[in-house]
């Protein structure tokens, strides 16, 4: 008990000394030991790394989970060391609603069939999103969070300890300075004409006491300097480790980009498949359109919007004499466009023809396009002046 009281009193004294030194430094009444420029640069780089890592981490979490309530729930589960429950993605939820709507409205109707196809695509998109979130969390968010909760806490702890060692060192310097000033004043030879013998004896005794105080202050200063240098070296090594942290975060960033690229490639592939499915059945749903299918036309459901679509083209009259699909690419000059089956299209991007059967395109130019029976729905016949050739639908904006 006595030992604990002595330790408590000693700790309280050290804390008070540091508080006094810190306050005097803030008011400019005490000298402060400055760190070298390289050390200050290391501190600044570490602080910048920590701040930007926090921002990137928070914004990536928002990207992966835009719902703030869901993010708070996941945070609480992690703090409680409990497994985060599986959550249905927005795409999967939309797929569920579309499937239920198709079941209620009639899965055999054109609208119901399309709802089923789109719901299956949305379900695949939701599964791809789930995989992307899982991969990005493991390969990118977890390393960033480990740095903030592990390495940075260690660095912060050692920096606080270095700050305390510096305050102790500066307090020892101030104490030594005061002791030397008092010693110099005490060793001043008194004037025997004005000083009584008794005061002279007291002055000599005080000089001896201040000599002991100076020796004690010098010893404390040496100890404080040694501890400060040791702690500065430990902190310096940790701060220099930030370079390794940057290398690790760079690798994690590459992994994040790779997972994001895979995710968007999967989404593109799923949507392209869906577009082909919808395009192959569009001619059967909307009469007066042709996309390369020979299915019989159904009664019209509604008038089409004047906005452009990539797969809707006027039907070619059956009376037109055209070359077989195998020979269409070789005899394009012999193919006459139908009188009522052409449309205008604006070119979205430059396109370089791969062979003589294709037509090179320039962005923003207007061309005439139409479809031929049996053609790939991703291609149309384009005409510009006397030139004619196949053009990809994705490079065009069909005008009403």
From Swiss-Prot:
| Keywords in alphabetical order | Acetylation, Coiled coil, Cytoplasm, Phosphoprotein, SH3 domain
Regions that span the bilayer: none
Q: Where is the SH3 domain?
A: 340-400
Taking the record's annotation, the residue ranges forming a coiled coil are 205-234
Identify the stretch(es) annotated as Membrane-binding amphipathic helix: 1-27
Q: Which residues carry this modification: Phosphoserine?
A: 10, 400
All residue ranges annotated as the BAR domain in the record: 24-287
Cellular localization per UniProt:
Cytoplasm
| UniProt-listed InterPro entries | AH/BAR_dom_sf (IPR027267), BAR_dom (IPR004148), Endophilin_B2_SH3 (IPR035640), Endophilin_SH3RF (IPR050384), SH3-like_dom_sf (IPR036028), SH3_domain (IPR001452)
N-acetylmethionine modification sites? 1
List, alphabetically, the CDD domains matched: BAR_Endophilin_B2, SH3_Endophilin_B2
Keyword Membrane recorded: no
Gene Ontology cellular-component terms listed: cytoplasm
Binding partners and assembly: Homodimer, and heterodimer with SH3GLB1.
Which family is it part of? Belongs to the endophilin family.
Note the PANTHER family from the entry: DREBRIN-LIKE PROTEIN-RELATED, SH3 DOMAIN-CONTAINING
Q: What is this protein called in UniProt?
A: Endophilin-B2
Originating species: Mus musculus (Mouse)
Question: Which lineage do the record's taxonomy fields give for this organism?
Answer: Eukaryota, Metazoa, Chordata, Craniata, Vertebrata
């Amino acid at each position: 008990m006595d030992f604990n009281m002595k330790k408590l009193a000693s700790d309280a004294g050290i804390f008070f000394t540091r508080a006094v030194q810190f306050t005097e430094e803030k008011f400019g009444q005490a000298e402060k030991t400055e760190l070298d420029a390289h050390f200050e640069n290391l501190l600044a780089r570490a602080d910048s790394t920590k701040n930007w890592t926090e921002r990137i981490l928070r914004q990536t979490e928002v990207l992966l989970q835009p719902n703030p309530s869901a993010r708070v729930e996941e945070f609480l589960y992690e703090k409680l060391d409990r497994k985060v429950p599986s959550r249905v993605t927005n795409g999967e939820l939309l797929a569920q609603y579309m499937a239920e709507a198709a079941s209620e409205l009639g899965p055999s109707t054109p609208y119901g069939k399309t709802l089923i196809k789109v719901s299956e695509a949305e379900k695949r998109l939701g599964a791809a999103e789930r995989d992307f979130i899982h991969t990005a969390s493991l390969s990118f968010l977890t390393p960033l969070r480990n740095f903030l909760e592990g390495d940075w806490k260690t660095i912060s702890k050692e920096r606080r300890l270095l700050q305390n060692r510096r305050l102790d060192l500066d307090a020892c310097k101030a104490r030594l300075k005061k002791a030397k000033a008092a010693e110099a004043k005490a060793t001043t030879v008194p004037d025997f004409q004005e000083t009584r013998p008794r005061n002279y004896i007291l002055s000599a005794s005080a000089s001896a006491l201040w000599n002991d105080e100076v020796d004690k202050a010098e010893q404390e200063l040496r100890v404080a300097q040694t501890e400060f240098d040791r702690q500065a070296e430990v902190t310096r090594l940790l701060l220099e480790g930030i370079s390794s942290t940057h290398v690790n975060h760079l690798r994690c960033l590459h992994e994040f980009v790779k997972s994001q690229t895979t995710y968007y490639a999967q989404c593109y592939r799923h949507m392209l498949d869906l577009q082909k499915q919808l395009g192959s059945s569009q001619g059967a749903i909307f009469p007066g359109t042709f996309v390369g299918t020979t299915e019989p036309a159904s009664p019209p459901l509604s008038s089409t919007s004047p906005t452009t679509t990539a797969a809707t083209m006027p039907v070619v009259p059956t009376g037109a004499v055209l070359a077989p699909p195998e020979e269409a690419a070789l005899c394009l000059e012999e193919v006459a466009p139908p009188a009522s089956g052409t449309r205008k299209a604006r070119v979205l991007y430059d396109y370089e023809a791969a062979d003589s059967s294709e037509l090179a395109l320039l962005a923003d130019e207007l061309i005439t396009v139409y479809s031929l029976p049996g053609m790939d729905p991703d291609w149309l016949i384009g005409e510009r002046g006397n030139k004619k050739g196949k053009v990809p639908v994705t490079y065009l904006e069909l005008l009403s």
